[in-house]
Amino acid sequence: MSHNTLPTVAELSGEMRERLATVKYVFTDLDATMLAPGSCVLRDNDGNPSTKLVEAVVALARAGIQVVPTSGRNRTMIHEDARVLGLNSYIGEMGGLVMYDLKANDWEYLTGDMPYDPSCGLTPHQVIEQTGVCEKILARWPHKIEYHNDMSTGYKYREVTVGMRGDVPDDEVQAILDEAGCGLIWACNGHLTHLSKPTT
């Protein structure tokens, strides 16, 4: 059995079979997990044509198991991923945006320790931008860090998080965030393997 193949329920016995029979949700990342390189649904990791992902999603749906993609992607991107795959829920922006029911448009922002009042008329992202903390980080490390906008066309809009990319000392950035008093956490959402062009 390869490292990425799980046994089927029929191959299991006893307690493990009973435990797996109670699974109702599969939470999974997208890139290099559900999707092949290049965010492709119909290819395998070697680039060969494959329907394995589609077959797995269909089999899980038939078993009554809901697949919930989770990603750092913004709403527009992950919404389309979920819609095309026939999924009804997703978690975007590193946990900051939860779509409970896509068909009913039932969603909410999760902002952790960041004080946020939805009645302010701004998104959490806009509230963060208004503090000036992002500009402070960019000014502290010129040419070392920049906004990471979604897609190579420079689509910037995010609702909860601020995407940045570069090589800066994590502890110093976190200190700047702590000083701003916004309850923000500096987190890594992975390493980029390809940059098509600067997006700032």
Describe each region flagged by the PLM.
Residues 20-23, 64, 87, 157-159:
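A general structural motif
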Residues 40-47:
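Short glycine-enriched, charge-decorated loop/helix-capping segments at active-site entrances
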Residues 1-30, 34-35:
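Non-catalytic pre-domain segments flanking phosphatase-related domains
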Residues 48-152:
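Active-site phosphate-binding/coordination module
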